[in-house]
Amino acid sequence: MLYLTEQDVTELLTMPEALAAVEQAFRALAVGDATSESRRRVRARDSVLMTMSAAMDSLGVFGLKAYTVAAGKARFHVSLYDAATGELLALIEADKLGQMRTGAASGIATKFLARESAETVGIYGTGWQAQSQLEAVCAVRKISRVTVFSRSAENCERFCQQMSHSLSVALLPVAEPEAAADADILITITSSREPVLKGAWLRPGTHLNAAGGNSILRREFDDDVLKRASFLTADSLAQSQMEAGEFVTAVEKGLLKWERVQELRHVVNGAMRGRKSDDDITLFKSLGLAIEDVVT
């Protein structure tokens, strides 16, 4: 059995590899070559265990991602099994893996939904996950400028310095959230329970990756974003109905029907066209799929 540590994953996995793997995962889902089960939660006192599983026939593997949140700390592991024999092939420490595949999912959505000419980014959030979100978007579009909003000015400045150096792109911290919305591509990667992005701020042609919330209690954008969007997509409709706070809230208010929400796999595989004009506003709601972990 192979055991990979966080350091191993950091040294071995590149963003181009993560992007290729996640695109492969979405294509496999589209043609029935892969299955991916939604996240499940088990609670004990103040701790929680989350599990999600997936299989891919052509790779001959299935896998399980399990992670705990206890005593203020999260721990992630992915187990890979031989689908023919059931043998445990690998156990992988998966915090970095999860960060990379989450960023890559937004990168693939951007590749297929953002305007080809998109060159500016606005990002809300400056934490661990924000790094790979921006790296992935910069890998699929030629980005010239990034505006960054965070509720912490110190974190915002630190993020701008770090990422401008690693990506060789100009990053500009902004004090007001509306200022970050003046961009071709928007990324929300926060844990906010109240919207940080308003639909009134969106300009025609914007693509939004909303990747911060996988809890029904979280809402990164308001109802007006959904009203203005021409095309809504998610990594999983079933998972969205359990975890996408923005969608669930809008459905409960009668502002959204689930039929409007399409799965990204159909766009990636060419069965569905997402963007139909340069003025369309497109949205990808990312919740995270086990198949992304298994294939990556």
Regions found by a protein language model. Name each.
Residues 130-131:
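N-terminal Rossmann-fold NAD(P) dinucleotide-binding loop
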Residues 167-183, 197-200:
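Short acidic low-complexity segments
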Residues 139-166:
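NAD(P)-binding Rossmann-fold cofactor-contacting core
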Residues 269-296:
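Glycine-rich phosphate/adenylate-binding loop
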Residues 202-204, 211-273:
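Rossmann-fold NAD(P)-binding glycine/threonine-rich loop
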Residues 126-127:
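Glycine-rich Rossmann-fold phosphate-binding loop(s) that bind the pyrophosphate
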Residues 1-99, 107, 117, 291:
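N-terminal ligand-binding/catalytic initiation module
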Residues 113-120, 142, 203-204:
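Short helix-loop-beta connector
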